[in-house]
């Protein structure tokens, strides 16, 4: 039996809310409340999830847990103010980990490469900051997310491809991680919708979706049993999920391509 994990619980909360909105069944709402209470019990007085998180490490991608809790808070009026206060406590701690150039410390899902986090977990963190800032109507969280998102968009548009990891000076290393690319594309889409003058976000999103589509439909992906699947690394022998086709990579790509389709229909 594996111990519960804060980040994984946040992912489940997203799914349970979608199920609750679709079915209206109270069991999902009741389960979500129990899960949220448990998550907040892992938050310390400084705003860190200091217990029961992945590897026992203190990390900033708890923002991606806070965001769905804020969405759920709209269904729990009695808890809303307390949950928002706890959310701010965590988000404020995350901002203490962000440098002036928008790079985030304590953002990797390993110990030995925490000094140069993967874009997969960077994207989780920035997306959570942006959504939480939007839900709380607090520009400081949104601006922190936009700053990091724009830095990575510039890197991508200049080079045509992102590295898999970036250090505190935004120097890249290792192979591109398509999962993180898809996640960033989702974030760039949100930013472009919120600010029509953020042309960089619209351009980066569109270019990334083209790149991901090419990767997912070329080479080995012409075989029927893996057609359309997005690989862990590009090239495939990169260090993240080497020679693998992780389901979450394809999931985020599908989300991003659906955004692209909706954007095209709207414009």
Predicted regions: what they are:
Residues 1-267:
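Glycan-recognition and catalytic cores of secretory/periplasmic carbohydrate-active enzymes
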């Amino acid at each position: 039996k594996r111990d519960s994990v804060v980040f994984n619980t946040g992912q489940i909360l997203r799914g349970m809310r979608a199920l609750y909105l679709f079915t209206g069944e109270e069991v999902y709402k009741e389960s979500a409340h129990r899960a949220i209470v448990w998550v907040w019990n892992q938050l310390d007085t400084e705003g860190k999830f200091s217990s029961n998180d992945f590897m026992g490490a203190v990390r900033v991608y708890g923002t991606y847990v806070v965001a769905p809790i804020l969405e759920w808070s709209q269904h729990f009026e009695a808890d809303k103010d307390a949950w928002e206060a706890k959310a701010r406590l965590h988000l404020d701690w995350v901002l203490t980990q962000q440098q002036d150039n928008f790079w985030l410390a304590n953002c990797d899902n390993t110990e030995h490469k925490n000094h140069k986090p993967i874009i997969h977990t960077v994207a989780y963190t920035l997306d959570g900051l942006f959504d939480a800032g939007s839900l709380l109507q607090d520009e400081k969280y949104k601006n922190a997310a936009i700053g990091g998102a724009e830095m990575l968009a510039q890197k991508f548009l200049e080079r045509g491809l992102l590295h898999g990891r970036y250090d505190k000076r935004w120097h890249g290393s290792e192979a591109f991680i398509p999962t993180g690319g898809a996640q960033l594309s989702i974030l760039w889409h949100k930013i472009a919708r919120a600010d029509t003058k953020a042309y960089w976000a619209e351009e980066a999103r569109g270019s990334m979706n083209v790149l991901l589509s090419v990767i997912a439909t070329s080479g080995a992906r012409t075989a029927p049993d893996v057609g359309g699947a997005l690989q862990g690394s590009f090239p495939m022998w990169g260090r993240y999920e080497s020679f693998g086709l992780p389901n979450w990579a394809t999931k985020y790509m599908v989300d991003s391509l659906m955004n692209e389709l909706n954007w095209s229909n709207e414009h």
